[in-house]
Amino acid sequence: MGPGEALLAGLLVMVLAVALLSNALVLLCCAYSAELRTRASGVLLVNLSLGHLLLAALDMPFTLLGVMRGRTPSAPGACQVIGFLDTFLASNAALSVAALSADQWLAVGFPLRYAGRLRPRYAGLLLGCAWGQSLAFSGAALGCSWLGYSSAFASCSLRLPPEPERPRFAAFTATLHAVGFVLPLAVLCLTSLQVHRVARRHCQRMDTVTMKALALLADLHPSVRQRCLIQQKRRRHRATRKIGIAIATFLICFAPYVMTRLAELVPFVTVNAQWGILSKCLTYSKAVADPFTYSLLRRPFRQVLAGMVHRLLKRTPRPASTHDSSLDVAGMVHQLLKRTPRPASTHNGSVDTENDSCLQQTH
């Protein structure tokens, strides 16, 4: 294993560890909070995080072994099963992101009718369609024996068949990426554009109210006025930043792998192994980006995490420090000294006799 493969293996280990931890946190938050579970977006997020968790636990270790050893798993039939999971989970993740973007558009564009338009039951039906579509493509690839170890990507996934089957395989690959990449990207862009329009209208209304309030409050302190203007600028760019991050992560993670897969179909193109492994690692990094983009950085999940940490800290007993133990010992000694009578000294006795004699003389 050369230095390039060692760097890619280290990158894959980091992606695997962060993906396991972040997606497990999302599932733990949804299991802890009943409010998150009953939302339609919560059902979609559970499906997305569960798929990423399975990808990190079952698929990424085999790719790591392929990078380190450069060969297929020794167990018979294991590579076909891992390739089936890889195709299914990648397609399911892309379609789940499209469903989440549609859910966000309905929540922002139709806030009063959102609960009736997309209930958890309808979200389950939507996920059933996504699962059925992903299973159809994975089952077709498994039935045609197109799943196996690909040395260009060091993973168990789709591999090039012999020359007579290349046209069918090319049509299947183009259809798979059209449904699993182009369609979710189009849905993501269209719904994000609608969300951005609604957010821009809301920002314009809030800016009008803010400017009128600043014009009426003439004696307002300049620092407060400047703070209001800064918040106004942040409010304008907040929706654009969130939408841009969602689209950019989707493109950065999926586009290199999809383009490499399509270029692999050209007869005179040979895929470099290091580039193929890097593009595969980028697809795995979507399992790291999605929990932070759609879950952990949002306010409901932050509140649930804070509540879980607070409850955990309340249950754990505090270890007694040396300062507290010294105070306890001092208190015990003080109570003991208060209970024991003090012996009268000779000096105090002489002073008492002198006081008694002085009192008798005055009387």
From Swiss-Prot:
It comes from the Eukaryota. GO terms for molecular function: G protein-coupled receptor activity. Residues 340-363 are annotated as: Disordered. The keyword Disulfide bond applies. GO terms for cellular component: plasma membrane. High level of expression in placenta. Expressed throughout the brain at low level. No expression detected in skeletal muscle, lung, heart, liver, pancreas, or kidney. Residues 29-47, 102-122, 190-242, 298-363 are cytoplasmic. The chain crosses the membrane at residues 8-28, 48-68, 81-101, 123-143, 169-189, 243-263, 278-297. It is a multi-pass membrane protein. Keywords: Cell membrane, Disulfide bond, G-protein coupled receptor, Membrane, Receptor, Transducer, Transmembrane, Transmembrane helix. PANTHER family: G-PROTEIN COUPLED RECEPTOR, G-PROTEIN COUPLED RECEPTOR 78. This is G-protein coupled receptor 78. It comes from Homo sapiens (Human). The gene is GPR78.
